UniProtKB/Swiss-Prot annotation:
HAMAP family, A to Z: CobS (MF_00719)
Taxonomic lineage of the native organism: Bacteria, Bacillati, Actinomycetota, Actinomycetes, Mycobacteriales
PANTHER family named among the record's database cross-references: ADENOSYLCOBINAMIDE-GDP RIBAZOLETRANSFERASE
Encoding gene per record: cobS
Name of the protein this chain belongs to: Adenosylcobinamide-GDP ribazoletransferase
Pfam families assigned to the protein according to its UniProt record, in alphabetical order: CobS
Membrane topology, record value: Multi-pass membrane protein
Predominant localisation class: membrane
Subcellular location: Cell membrane
One GO CC term on file: plasma membrane
MF GO annotations: adenosylcobinamide-GDP ribazoletransferase activity; cobalamin 5'-phosphate synthase activity
Length: 241
């Protein structure tokens, strides 16, 4: 378990954690714990910003998103950008994967990144501390779900090959149940939180399924997209009302 946590934090954060092995099944299973730590960090920034800035200011949310980007090396948002560019191009899967590996950001990807960062920043500023934690954890639970059994890796993807199909269904179900239980306390209405995170996870699963059809399987970029889309939609759902 300690090795799995070390691998998860080495993969999902900038912390100089030594991992005895690369990213694999154990590290992916433990990834929601990384989300819990990152969510607590973002929530602390929002809480402190609430004291520092005027009521209703979006700056606490902006700073929280900035801290998350720094703490994750921008890994997930970069993957989201590449995935959007890949989905936005024409041609066979090989062409889409080549676009994703190119390293440069296209206009479609840049526009999508701006929207996602803006929505996260604005919603985080409106959420309770626990709701911020819940949204960030939801993004990491989505990665576990994306790597469930039967999901293939795209051709040539090193990370995809290491983690695709690695998560048993009971692990996926367990994390989703735990996330829904946490979300009960994230909003004044006890049903809103679970509904918000379940819808967000469902949308992420639909995105991953589309990527599997388009690319022939998942890649590390697709997992980054799952993180960002789920976090954004969960935060949006938790902020309603």
């Amino acid at each position: 378990m300690i090795r799995s946590l070390a691998g998860a934090f080495a993969f999902g954060t900038v912390l100089p954690v030594r991992a005895s092995a690369g990213v694999g099944r154990g590290a992916l299973t433990a990834l929601p714990f990384v989300g819990l730590a990152l969510g607590a960090l973002a929530a602390a920034v929002v809480w402190a910003g609430g004291w520092a800035f005027a009521a209703g200011s979006p700056l606490p949310g902006v700073l929280a998103v900035a801290v998350l980007l720094l703490a994750t090396r921008g890994l997930h948002i970069d993957g989201f950008c590449d995935t959007v560019d890949g989905l936005g191009c024409y041609g066979p899967p090989e062409r889409a994967l080549a676009v994703m590996r190119d390293g440069s950001a296209g206009p479609f990807g840049v526009a999508a990144v701006v929207v996602v960062i803006a929505v996260q920043a604005l919603t985080f500023a409106e959420l309770s501390v626990l709701a911020v934690v819940t949204a960030v954890v939801a993004g990491r639970v989505a990665v576990v779900a994306a790597c469930r059994r039967s999901v293939p890796a795209a051709a040539g993807s090193t990370l995809g090959a290491a983690v695709a199909g690695s998560q048993p269904r009971w692990v996926v179900a367990g994390w989703i149940v735990a996330l829904a239980a946490l979300a009960v306390f994230a909003c004044p209405r006890p049903w809103q939180g679970p509904l918000a995170v379940l819808v967000a996870i469902g949308c992420s699963l639909a995105l991953v399924a589309h990527c599997v059809r388009r690319f022939g399987g998942i890649t590390g970029d697709v997992l980054g997209a799952a993180v960002e889309v789920t976090t954004t939609l969960a935060a949006l759902g938790l902020a309603i009302g």
